[in-house]
Amino acid sequence: MNYLCLVVTLVAVAGAISGEKFSDDNTGYQSTPSLRIRTTPGRRRQTPRTIGPPYTRRTLRTTTDYSTTVENGNLTTPAANSTEKGNGLYGLRRQTPRTIGPPYTRRTLRTTTGYWTTVEKGNGTTPAANSTEKGNRPYGRRRQTPRTIGPPYTRRTTTDYWAAVEKGYLTTPAANSTEKESRPNATQRREISWTFGPLYTWRTTKGYGTTLETTNATSTS
């Protein structure tokens, strides 16, 4: 009798152990037919896997924080090897840089470290694929890829959307002008000046309220 009881017990234990160890239902449980172990609410590890058709592929990634959510729409593909290691606010996530759209409206989904960095969808407002916001900037501040647009005498380049784009003659910000830090007002900025042609001097300003003044032969602050 004791032998029979031992056999029955071993069979039951083997059946429980042979069950599926990890569930794919995003409940936070590791489940077997006879055992359910509750992990910390919201914190779970996922097996990275790529799903969906070619143009909407997305990857479920390994998460270490519940604030890393999986984007389910087009062109919002978290990287398979991307993990959020800090205790971030809900919605903070990292994206895989991808360039999309026709030649004149190309834009790039960039690596984001905060949810305030949104993707510009218009002409000439292309975030750089390697551009990351490293400081604590107010909502909406971001860096753009410099692009020169317009006919020859009205060419202009955008570097940040809060720096207004001048639309007149000879008011062209330089393509190498970037905002590198948050400056409190328009008086604290660095200027790069150079002369172009016999009559006109162009300059580049960095900082809040960057305005470009253009006069014959001279350009003043």
Curated annotation (Swiss-Prot):
Residues 25-34, 70-85, 123-133 have a biased composition (Polar residues). Residues 20-45, 191-221 form a propeptide. Keywords: Cleavage on pair of basic residues, Secreted, Signal. Residues 48-69 have a biased composition (Low complexity). Salivary glands. Residues 21-155 are annotated as: Disordered. Residues 1-19 form the signal peptide. It is found in: Secreted. One of its GO terms (cellular component) is extracellular region. This is Immunoregulatory peptides.
